[in-house]
């Protein structure tokens, strides 16, 4: 399931809602060179038209949200969860925060709200995120989500037209798809056996 009819998610300070074409101008205005330098697929410059095209392109394959401050509706950033093209049981999360609103924990709060929704609506078993080795802010978000490191790999970065070393973290769904009758935090009997041999964990 993509983000069609995706209802807003509310947290104590934020509202996450489906990105719309009408958000393109505001999102493009927030994207900066400093933010783009930390992202794999957001090359500068960003125009309203280009942002609208991104929204249309990504909506069918996942959940893409603008992040607004609940108190005043100010747009502070973006968070998404997209199915990976190589594995339908896996999704990749990404996020960015406008420079003027960094340092307040907004992305950590937004990502934590989106993660369980991504598992439920996308029906995936694993959610991952990756970042440059020195992107400590993103790794702090990943740890807060309960993600654990799974190692590094070189990935193609369209924003800079090259392959870069990226460190990945991931988290597995607490229970397999189809076992939603279990109480939250309760594992299926076969869960531990299924995990044997697995390595410990954009």
List the predicted regions and their residue ranges:
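Acyl-donor (CoA/ACP) binding surface of acyl/acetyltransferases
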Residues: 1-39, 64-202
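A generic membrane alpha-helix/interface feature
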Residues: 50-51, 59, 141, 164
């Amino acid at each position: 399931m993509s983000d069609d009819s995706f209802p807003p998610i509310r947290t104590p300070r934020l509202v996450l809602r489906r990105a719309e074409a009408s958000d393109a101008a505001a999102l493009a205005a927030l994207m900066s060179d400093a933010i783009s330098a930390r992202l794999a697929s957001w090359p500068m410059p960003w125009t309203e038209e280009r942002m609208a095209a991104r929204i249309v392109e990504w909506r069918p394959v996942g959940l893409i949200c603008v992040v607004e401050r609940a108190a005043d509706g100010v747009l502070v950033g973006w968070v998404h969860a997209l199915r990976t093209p190589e594995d339908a049981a896996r999704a990749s999360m990404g996020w960015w925060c406008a420079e003027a609103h960094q340092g307040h924990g907004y992305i950590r709060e937004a990502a934590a709200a989106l993660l369980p929704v991504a598992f439920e609506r996308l029906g995936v078993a694993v959610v991952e995120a990756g970042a440059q080795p020195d992107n400590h802010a993103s790794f702090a978000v990943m740890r807060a989500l309960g993600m654990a490191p799974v190692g590094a790999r070189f990935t193609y970065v369209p924003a800079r037209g090259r392959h870069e070393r990226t460190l990945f973290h991931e988290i597995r769904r607490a229970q397999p798809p189809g076992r939603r009758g279990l109480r939250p935090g309760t594992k299926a009997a076969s869960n531990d056996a299924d995990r044997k041999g697995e390595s410990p964990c954009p």
